[in-house]
């Protein structure tokens, strides 16, 4: 079975506080199976003070600019946080396997609360999601973090979007006046477009969700 790409957004993360931090490799942190393939969230150790300062829940994003040849590339990683007050309040400790992505064992980065992230999860591990519909609330375990999320949309393996107002899971060609599936350039425009129904089937590859608390 192919993987589902699950996009998880946190509606409580609106105006994130951003802080410049020093990121260091720590041999206390082991790499997590699947983190390089986007199947699991890597771990970052931080001080309780930094967690409170940034208003974090369970996730942290680190972002920096990396020079690649004559180009500057944005590098961003989402982490599951672990509190360790041996970590200075202006530092974040990560595993060496993740530091490879940044090209250094020590570097400066912007740290902030994660707004959204994507994980690839084997369909066989989410068998309960087949048949669920847009608007349904499901439970996920993301790298040991239990989450309750609401399905808000998705798309199939051809890129056709799911629509909340189309029952079932089959593809249909409909006359649309707005998204998802059609973004009119002028008021009143309508077009026939192919879309998916509101039910998740094995043909769906991306599922969009928001965290429910």
Curated annotation (Swiss-Prot):
GO terms for biological process: translation. GO terms for cellular component: ribonucleoprotein complex; ribosome. InterPro entries: Ribosomal_eS6, Ribosomal_eS6_arc, Ribosomal_eS6_CS. Keywords: Ribonucleoprotein, Ribosomal protein. Transmembrane segments: none annotated. The keyword Ribonucleoprotein applies. PROSITE patterns: RIBOSOMAL_S6E. Pfam families: Ribosomal_S6e (PF01092). One of its GO terms (molecular function) is structural constituent of ribosome. Belongs to the eukaryotic ribosomal protein eS6 family. HAMAP family: Ribosomal_eS6. PANTHER family: 40S RIBOSOMAL PROTEIN S6 (PTHR11502). This is Small ribosomal subunit protein eS6. The gene is rps6e.
């Amino acid at each position: 079975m192919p993987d589902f790409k699950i996009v998880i957004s946190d509606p409580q993360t609106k105006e994130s506080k951003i802080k410049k931090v020093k990121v260091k490799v720590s041999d206390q942190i082991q790499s997590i199976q699947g983190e390089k393939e986007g199947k699991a969230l890597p771990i970052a150790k931080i001080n309780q003070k930094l967690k409170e300062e940034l208003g974090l829940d369970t996730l942290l994003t680190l972002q920096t600019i990396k020079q690649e040849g004559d180009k500057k590339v944005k590098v961003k990683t989402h982490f599951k946080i672990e509190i360790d007050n041996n970590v200075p309040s202006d530092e974040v400790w990560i595993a060496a396997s993740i530091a490879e992505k940044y090209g250094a064992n020590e570097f400066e980065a912007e740290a902030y609360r994660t707004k959204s992230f994507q994980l690839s999860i084997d369909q066989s591990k989410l068998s309960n999601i087949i048949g669920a519909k847009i608007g349904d609330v499901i439970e996920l375990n993301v790298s040991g973090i239990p989450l309750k999320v609401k399905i808000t949309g998705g798309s199939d393996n051809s890129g056709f979007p799911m629509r909340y107002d189309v029952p079932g899971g089959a593809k249909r060609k409909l006359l649309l006046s707005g998204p998802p599936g059609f973004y009119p350039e002028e008021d009143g425009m309508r077009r026939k477009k192919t879309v998916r129904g509101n039910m998740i089937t094995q043909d769906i590859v991306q599922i969009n969700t928001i965290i429910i608390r």
